Structures are given as structure tokens and as C-alpha cells.
A protein has these predicted regions:
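Glycine-rich, positively charged N-terminal anion/phosphate-binding segment
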Residues: 2, 17-89
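Alpha/beta catalytic cores of nucleotide-metabolism and tRNA/nucleoside-modifying enzymes
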Residues: 8, 18, 23-24, 120-123, ...
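Hydrophobic faces of well-ordered beta-strands that scaffold small-molecule active sites
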Residues: 12-16, 37-39, 64-68, 91, ...
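Active-site beta-loop-alpha junctions enriched in small/polar residues
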Residues: 17-19, 42-44, 69-71, 96-98, ...
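Active-site beta->alpha loop and helix N-cap motifs at the rims of alpha/beta catalytic domains
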Residues: 64-133, 138-145, 155-156
Length: 335
């Protein structure tokens, strides 16, 4: 897949997620086969004020796209130019986030209500940057205002290189099912690449989205949490057939490796604090996970964290289905 002058090896992308897609997570996604990673959402105004203190791109994390959000055309254009100068391989502009604070500020999905402003912003940004420029949108504001096709055509006319669409409305948030049919409608309406997003939780669903909608790529967000195996597309160009749920031993090994990546970036104390949420996602749905998650909340040291992880996986592997993790009957296991 090609974005402007950027050739990508694989059609699976890691979606930008606030508080999640930091450097270690992007690194892991790339190692697992992800074709393009995105930074966490970056405030255009914040980037202009704080520069490198607000955004750092490492030499070994290419290709990477910086996703910006904002509502002021001049500010967004200046921030895009800065991100490009700082090493971004592509710039993405967020018009899909339904978060209350963004919407109230006239940013994110709120912009889809104002097509003329969208045109103004994209035209100005396109004039400022030479790198591939993409946008992230939703279906529209609500069920009575589905305008993804209209916004996509405007973007194409402004010289945007690709469009990512999450086919839910602002009102839906993340409820209900993503309307994949709308991805296909957008694809038919424009000539630039279209990337689908929404409800992809395993490699087979990514393949299904590509085939069903005709889209050029698949952006994966929540489906990658605790599940880096989802980027199951390899250099051979064939989809790798893997079980939907990796073996327990593989999960435990991945947790350890992922933690080391986080520790190398944030330091040991920062890693313990930052990594707990990832452990929740890796172990979600396993027997006794609720009790295990409760125990994690009080852990502050690396040694205690790994002791708890080891004890928990030992508990699960022994098949203690009828006991809760940490109960009296398995206290010898948990220490």
C-alpha cells in the first residue's frame, strides 16, 4: 500500500490511542508485523508551545505517523509543519474522536458538522507539508447526519493522500456494531486509499474487512490491546493462521517482553505504574482475572509484579477453574 510517496509493507495499521500508543507499544506493534504506527493524539496548540517536550520521534521507529487534533486552521498547519520537521513520515488529522473535551473545543468529530471548515483546514495543511497527509473520520455526527462520503470527497479534493474511517457516529461512541458497509461506500466514492477501522479483534477479521469492503488497509485500535498477535500479516504476503487466543505460555512470555520494552523507555518505576493496564488486557477473560487484577492495583515494585504474574499463570495452567485466584485453597500457589 502506498501513502503519497510512502510505500508500506503491510496493510495493517496501529490506531492512535491516548495513553496507550507510546513508543514501546508502537515498537512492539512494528515487530509483530504492523505496517504503520501512529503516535498518541497530539494537540496542535501543545506542540507549538512545547515542541520536542511534547513530541519525540526516535530514529528507529519509522515509518510513523503523527496524529494531530485541533480546530484552528493556522495552528494545525503550523503544527503539521513542525511534526514533519521533527521526523514524522506522515501527518494524520483527527476528525473522528468523540471525546467530550475535544468536541466541546470544536475539534475531533465535531469538525464533521462543518464541511467548509474541514476544507479550510485541509487546504491550509496541505500547503504547509510535503509528507503524506491523511485524515481519520467517523460516519458522522448521528444517525441523521451520516456525511462520511461528503467529507471524504472534500478531503480528496484538498489533496489528502488517504482516509481512515471508523464507521460509527459520534453519538454511538464505541457502542453497537461498526457499519462496514459505509467503508465500502467511501472506497467507491474516492480514488485515494481508504483504511477501515472498527470491530477488528483478530487477523481473520482484518482479512474479512479488506475483502468485504474493498478498503486498502485496516487500522486496529482496541483489538490490539493485550493482543499484539493481531498483526498477523507477514512478509510472504499471506495471512498467518493463528488461534484467536495464544497459548498461556506465549501470553506470559509476551507480557515479560512487553514490560522490558516499557522499562527501557520509562524506567523501572514508571514501567510498573504504566504497565498494569497492559497486564489487565493480556489476562482479560482468563479464570480468576478479576481477583488477579485487584491484587495488581497495590503492587509498586517490579519483583512483586513478576511474582504475581508468575503465580497467576501457574494458577491458570493448573486449571483452578472453581477457585478464585488468591483463595485459601490455592494460597500456596500465590505465596
Amino acid at each position: 500500500m502506498r501513502l503519497g510517496n510512502l510505500q508500506l509493507d503491510h496493510p495493517l495499521f496501529l490506531a492512535p490511542m491516548s495513553g496507550i500508543t507510546d513508543y514501546p507499544f508502537r515498537q512492539l506493534a512494528r515487530e509483530m508485523g504492523c505496517g504503520l504506527v501512529f503516535t498518541e493524539m497530539v494537540s496542535a496548540e501543545g506542540l507549538i508551545r512545547k515542541g520536542e517536550a511534547f513530541l519525540k520521534i526516535k530514529k528507529d521507529e519509522h515509518p510513523v505517523s503523527v496524529q494531530l487534533f485541533g480546530s484552528n486552521p493556522e495552528v494545525i498547519a503550523e503544527a503539521a509543519q513542525m511534526a514533519e520537521a521533527m521526523g514524522a513520515d506522515a501527518i494524520d488529522f483527527n476528525m473522528g474522536c468523540p471525546a467530550k473535551q475535544l468536541v466541546e473545543a470544536g475539534a475531533g468529530v465535531d469538525l464533521m458538522r462543518f464541511p467548509e471548515k474541514v476544507k479550510e483546514i485541509l487546504t491550509m495543511v496541505r500547503r504547509k507539508v510535503k509528507s503524506p497527509l491523511t485524515i481519520k473520520i467517523r460516519s458522522g455526527w448521528d444517525s441523521k447526519n451520516i456525511n462520511a462520503v461528503e467529507i471524504s470527497k472534500i478531503a480528496e479534493d484538498c489533496g489528502i493522500d488517504a482516509i481512515s474511517i471508523h464507521p460509527r457516529t459520534k453519538d454511538q461512541g464505541f457502542r453497537g456494531r461498526a457499519d462496514w458497509k459505509l467503508i465500502g461506500e467511501v472506497k467507491k466514492a474516492v480514488r485515494i486509499p481508504v483504511v477501515g477501522n472498527g470491530d477488528v479483534t483478530q487477523p481473520s477479521l482484518a482479512k474479512e474487512m479488506l475483502e468485504e469492503t474493498g478498503c486498502d488497509g485496516v487500522m486496529i485500535g482496541r483489538g490490539a490491546l493485550g493482543n499484539p498477535w493481531i498483526f498477523g500479516f507477514k512478509n510472504s504476503g499471506r495471512w498467518e493462521e493463528k488461534p484467536a487466543t495464544p497459548p498461556l505460555g506465549e501470553k506470559q512470555r509476551m507480557i515479560h517482553y512487553h514490560f522490558l520494552l516499557v522499562q527501557a523507555h520509562w524506567g523501572e518505576k514508571g514501567a510498573v505504574k504504566t504497565f498494569r493496564k497492559h497486564i489487565y488486557w493480556y489476562t482479560k477473560g482468563l479464570p480468576g482475572c478479576s481477583s488477579f487484577h485487584s491484587k495488581l492495583s497495590g503492587i509498586r515494585e517490579k519483583e512483586a509484579l513478576f511474582e504475581a504474574i508468575h503465580s497467576y499463570f501457574d494458577f491458570v495452567q493448573k486449571g483452578n477453574q472453581c477457585q478464585s485466584f488468591g483463595s485459601a485453597k490455592n494460597r500456596s500457589v500465590t505465596g
